[in-house]
Regions:
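Substrate-binding groove/exosite segments of carbohydrate-active enzymes
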Residues: 235-366
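Acidic/polar, glycine-enriched structural segments that form the non-catalytic walls/loops
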Residues: 1-296
Length: 366
């Protein structure tokens, strides 16, 4: 999704010479991570069920987030849930979730429903602004996909998802129920359980964008990649992911002695930097909030050169810092155009304060 942008019309109560007509933003992605949990007549809802225990943690060393909980449904059914979630650093187009449910006192059917959800709600200034169109969604017996397109810039992204399902650590091959709606696609798969039994679903999602692939090939490419990584399997993929993070920490870790809070803080900053920017594409950059939320639209500010380049310059191969600077250099023609709008000439360059594509996206310059 990095590098995919959307042009949002500038809205101000006054207008000055040089104001940009559009504000670029990185659009919020479709929800590839959704997995619903259903019993015979109930569906997991943490707002309506009793949460007997809950723990969520992030292992920054290995790049894995965990969530553990014990819950009781309104009908008294008790479950223990364990979730592992990664965005793969060794295969950056791949996202994985392992979702495990154990019955404490429940007898009946447990269904897990992995979904690709295109019902996107933005948290930014205009939550009702429609950014994505659904070009096509569909499924086969083993894979589902959601093909999307931004409304103005015609950038496209395709998500493809497949899964493995286990009961008591043994893979099952029961035929799933296909879910095909206008903006959702996926499967429902389940098993009958008694107290002490457990079921596990591993969800493999591959994401392909028009930044790297021909639009006509996005569905084929993402589906093929999802099926390929399923054949490789969770254990191998997660070991690749762990090794990738180990190489990052061996290269960039900062050790602070005697201050555990500062130590955790600096490592969290490093973790978020690498979650946002890998350094292998000079068309990409780092927004002030990384990919932690929608603030600032994911745009690049001057903070990159001030705050991020020094870190990468001192701790990583020179190509990474070089690519960050190449990002600016490649936008020189737009910087000259920006200066011309304000009356400058003879090749004067005004690099933008806020941008994704080289055009100034901020209405007031600092």
């Amino acid at each position: 999704m990095a590098g995919i942008t959307f042009l949002d019309k500038t809205r101000v109560g006054w207008w000055k010479n040089g104001f940009p007509p559009y504000y670029t933003r990185i659009p919020k992605a479709a929800d590839w991570s959704r997995i619903n949990l259903r019993l015979i007549d109930e569906e997991l809802d943490l707002a309506g069920w009793d949460v007997d225990s809950f723990n969520r943690r992030l292992d920054m060393k290995e790049g894995i987030s965990y969530r553990d909980m014990e819950v009781t449904s309104p009908r008294g059914n008790q479950l223990r849930i364990h979730v592992e979630h990664i965005t793969n650093m060794a295969r950056p187009n791949l996202c994985l979730i392992k979702y495990s449910v154990s019955s404490i006192n429940y007898t009946g059917r447990i269904s897990l429903v992995p979904i690709l959800d295109g019902n996107i709600v933005d948290d930014a200034d205009l939550p009702n602004l429609k950014i994505w169109n659904i070009l096509r969604s569909g499924s086969t017996s083993s894979c589902a996909y959601l093909w999307t397109q931004t409304r103005r810039e015609d950038a496209q992204v395709c998500y493809a998802m497949t899964y493995q399902f286990f009961k008591n650590n043994k893979e099952t091959t029961a035929n799933p129920i296909r879910i095909e709606k206008e903006k959702q696609t996926g499967f429902s798969v389940g098993a009958d359980v008694k107290p002490g039994d457990n079921v596990t679903l591993i969800k493999y999602t591959a994401i392909a964008s028009s930044l790297y692939h021909e639009r006509s090939e996005l569905v084929e490419h993402s589906v093929a990649e999802a099926l390929e990584v399923k054949s490789i399997g969770w254990n191998t993929l997660i070991e690749e992911h762990r090794r990738a993070w180990q190489e990052i920490w061996d290269e960039t870790d900062v050790v602070i002695e005697g201050d555990p809070e500062a130590q955790q803080g600096i490592r969290y900053n490093i973790f978020q930097l690498y979650q946002t920017y890998r350094g292998d594409d000079p068309r990409l950059n780092i927004g002030p909030k990384g990919f932690t939320g929608e603030k600032y639209g994911g745009n690049t500010y001057w903070n990159t050169e001030l705050c991020c380049v020094p870190f990468f310059l001192l701790s990583t191969p020179k190509e990474i810092a070089k690519n960050l600077l190449a990002y600016r250099h490649n936008q020189l023609p737009k910087a000259i155009e920006n200066a011309r709008k304000l009356g400058f000439k003879d090749g004067a360059a005004l690099f933008p304060q806020v941008t994704n594509n080289g055009e100034e996206c901020h209405s007031e310059w600092e």
